Amino acid sequence: MPAPTFLGIGAQKAGTTWLFSMIAQHPEVCSGNRKELHYFNIPRRWSKGREWYEAQFTENPTGRAVGECTPAYLWTDVDPSYLDREKHLPDIAGRVAGMYPGLRLVVCLRHPVSRARSAMNEIVKKGPRFGLRPGLSIREAASRRPSIVEKGRYAVNLTEWMKHFPREAFLVLIYERDILPDAAKAATLRRVFEHIGVAPSFQPVGLTDRKNVRLKPYDIRVRYAGRIGRRALKLVPPAFQDHPALDFPDDPEGEQWLWSVYEPEIRDLEDLLGQRLLWNRPRAEVHDY
């Protein structure tokens, strides 16, 4: 069974689905049988043991790199009070380093306010049983699911990872600069392929495909509506299902609160990475880069 040589460790909602779909096409890569194996962060997966984990990787006689991408791995500095609520193991970086100390690590980071909003929307999209609902304020959502905020504390979590792995083990990509713009994607993949030790000239298909496209507000309203509400919503003609009236209100106060949490962290991250990030207001714009 092949042992991993690289990991994509996050962040959540920062382009990792697209990145893994590109990496998995490379003929020299043995990828996991699915994108996110959650071995190091979910207790029931961890309990299956190393043999189970390594059995999840495809056999590839030409494989030079073996790995998977679970965005939750970046969140290694976890407040103990969150562990049971989030079903998340502590000290992921230490667990990974204890088993595979020579790994190459790929990190994708997105403006933390935008990432938090996207993470919140993703939980809402999954349905009522996940504890959030459409129109909930950011602060209320964060009180119910602390990971919405905590997973955006990049400096704190990367610092923990860098206690276990040398700087040269990390390739850090910025979503708004390296992943979202179509013009940047080919160069980004060359850097990734070089970092994990496979031929950088490979060109995967679907380079500009969109992954994890956001559900229309109409579809989310149908998911949360009662029986009578669903019947009424189904009378809305398809041409009007994207109408702004069906969208959920913005939460500028909540975004400003997130910014007050994250702004000092962004400055710490810049110091840690030795580069300036143009995340200088509550939301990032692609043309900032």
Feature names for model-found ranges:
Residues 1-289:
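Anion-recognition interface
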